[in-house]
Amino acid sequence: SRGLGDVYKRQALDAAQARYAAERTKRLRVDGNEQYSELAGTFADFDTDPYVEPGFTRDPIVEETTAVIVGGGFAGMLTAVELKRLGMHDFRMIEKGGDFGGTWYWNRYPGCQCDVESYTYLPLLEETGFMPTRRYSSATEIFEYCQLIGRRFELYPHALFQTEIADAVWYDDEGCWLVTTSRGDEIRCKYFVTAGGILHKAKLPGIPGI
């Protein structure tokens, strides 16, 4: 009967969900990021930027601007491009790395490439006229495309590279943020945009002896 068929379907669905839940549980780690080795001591070199010359310095910047964007990957760049489209050209971009790219700045190891079709993944293709050379672009091509976006939309003058956020405090009486950085910058802004990613730091397995 139809009623019995519905029962069988419900049982099959419950069984499938139980299997998926069991597999998910196998892959969950209660120790979170504690499962990884700390990037210190013999592993300290993994916490440095291999793509820049050591010893970079610059004078601290003290300024007021409309917006501060944290992150120079696609999220940060697209935010900046959209601000320019809206007529806002008074903003700063703060990026830990030495160039635009985010994930694709840090991850350039041999064979690294995107697992999403390039024509879907890469933004602003119509605006830049860029045509990916492969269905799944290599990390190198994506990084170079990020640089192209930076040049095409004139984002480089807005960027503070090799710089990290130290603090961001909202002052209600002044109606602004005070953003301080690892370079001693003090930047006041009305809008503070967090556009950072999660794939910029090495995660080494916490296996004894390695």
Task: Show the residue positions of the predicted features.
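Short, small-residue-biased leader/transition segments that mark boundaries at the very start
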Residues: 1-8
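Non-catalytic terminal and boundary segments that flank Rossmann-like NAD(P)-dependent oxidoreductase
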Residues: 9-60
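Glycine-rich active-site loop/strand segments that organize a redox cofactor
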Residues: 19, 29, 105-145
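Glycine-rich dinucleotide-binding loop and its adjacent helix/turn
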Residues: 40-57, 64, 122-132, 138-142, ...
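N-terminal Rossmann-like FAD-binding beta1-loop-alpha1 element of flavoenzymes
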Residues: 63-93
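Glycine-rich FAD pyrophosphate-binding loop
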Residues: 84-109
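Short, solvent-exposed loop/turn and secondary-structure capping segments
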Residues: 103-105, 190-191, 202-208
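Feature captures the FAD/FMN-dependent oxidoreductase FAD-binding
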Residues: 132-200
